[in-house]
Amino acid sequence: MAQEDIFKKIVSHCKEYGFVFPSSDIYDGLGAVYDYGQMGVELKNNIKEYWWKSMVLLHENIVGVDSAIFMHPTIWKASGHVDAFNDPLIDNKDSKKRYRADVLIEDQIAKYEEKINKEIAKAQKRFGEAFDEAQFRATNGRVLEIQAKMEALHTRFATALNDGNLEELRQIIIDEEIVCPISGTKNWTEVRQFNLMFSTEMGSTADGAMKVYLRPETAQGIFVNYLNVQKTGRMKIPFGIAQIGKAFRNEIVARQFIFRMREFEQMEMQFFVRPGTELEWFKTWKETRLKWHKALGFGDDHYRYHDHEKLAHYANAATDIEFLMPFGFKEVEGIHSRTDFDLSQHEKYSGKNIKYFDPELNENYVPYVIETSIGVDRMFLSIMSASYVEEALENGETRVVLKLPAALAPVKLAVMPLVKKDGLPEKAREIIDGLKFHFNCQYDEKDSIGKRYRRQDAIGTPYCITVDHQTLEDECVTLRNRDTMEQTRVRITELQSIIADKVSITALLKTLQL
C-alpha cells in the first residue's frame, strides 16, 4: 500500500475512534487546528507523563515550571522573535494561493531524491540479490547527474536562506521551474517575509492597551524564570528546568494533519551548564534523548540524527532526531547548544544581573544552555503512525490494530462479560471496581466477543479480560494479549500484578536506567 494511502487511513482512524477531531467540526472546522478526543487525550497525557517523569523524576537536578502564555512583549524583542521570526512567502497570481518559498524548494529537493530512489528500485529489480546499492550510487550516470543537480540546488538554497536573500529564493523557484500545485503555472509574486507570531492587546481601553503576543515557543518562559528557580531551589550548575505547554504560530502552510499546526504543545528542557562544557553536555543529551525514543520499541530503523550544517548565529551545535513518518523522515525533537545567547539577551534588555555565581570557580558568569525540545503533537503522530497495523488473519479476515507501547495506551484493560446475563455483567463490574484505581479500564458488553476484541484492538488496548460462566466457579478469567491474540486463564487476584508489570510508566522508565 502506498505511504500516502496509509497516512490517509491513519487520519481517518484517528477521527473514527476518538483520537483527533477537526476543531469546530460542526462549523466545518478551522484550518490547521485540531481537538483531541477521548482516546487522544489519554494517549497524549501518557506521552507527557513519560517525558515529564523521565526528566524530573529520574534527574535530581531537573525541576519543572509552568510559565504564562502571555509575557512582557520586550521578552520577544530580546529573543529576536519580533524582528526575525519570519517565513518567506510567495503567492501564485493565478490560483491566488500562498506558499512558503522554502517549502516549495524543499519539495523540489525531495523530488530529486525520489528520482534517485526510483532509479535504485529499478536496478534492484533488475539485478536482484547481486545488486550493490553503494556502487550503483557511485557509478550510475543518471544517478550522478540527478545527485549533482540536487546538491547544487541544496547549496544555493542554504546560502539564500542563511543570507536572507528573498530575491534569490524567488530566482531558485523560477530556475527550477517550480509550478503551483493548484494552477500548474509559474506565475509567481515576489518573496516577502511574514512574522509568525499572533498578537493581541492587553488592557481595558484602546489607548492604554499594550500589544502582547501568544508565545511562539515555551523556552523563553524558562529563561526569564531561570534566576527565580535557581535561587529558590538552591540549584547548582549543571541543572535543568522542564516545561510542557502550548505555543502558537501563524503558520501559512500548515499541513500533514497534526504535524504542523497553529496551536501546538511543546515539551522543553533547558539545561544550564558551565561555559566550556556545553559540547560535552550536548553529546550526552543527544544520546540520552535518542535512547528515550528508542525505549518505545519501534525499532532503530525508525530513527536517525540530522546534524545541522548551517547553525543559527547563537548556536554552536544542533541536531534533530527524525522519525520515519508515512511521508518520510521528519523532525520530532531538536537538541541545541544555544550558548549564552538567550540569558545574555534577557540580561541586556531587562537591565537585571542574572549571572550565576560558581562557588567552585569563585566567579560569576552567564550559563550556557543545552536545549531539548519535542513537539507533543508530532510525537503523538509518530506513535500513531508506527503503531497502526492492518493484519491478515488465518481465517482470511483483516484486523486493524494499534500496537501502541502498552505504557502509553489510552485504555490499559477492557473487561467483558461473555454474555449479558447469568451474573456475568455483575462479576465483570466487580473486577473493574477492584482495578480502576490502578488502570484506565473499559467495560464492554455490546456485540459478540469477537467484535468487542476488534474494537479494543483498534484503540490499542493491550489486554482484554473475558468473564465467563467458569469464572463464577473458579475465580479465573481469560486474559487476551492484543499483539499475539493469545489467551490464558488467570486468577482474578493475580490480575493487578500481572498487568501492572506490562503497562506501567514505571516499567518503561526503568528501561532508561539500563
Residue ranges and their predicted role:
Residues M1-L514:
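NTP/phosphate- and nucleic-acid-binding module
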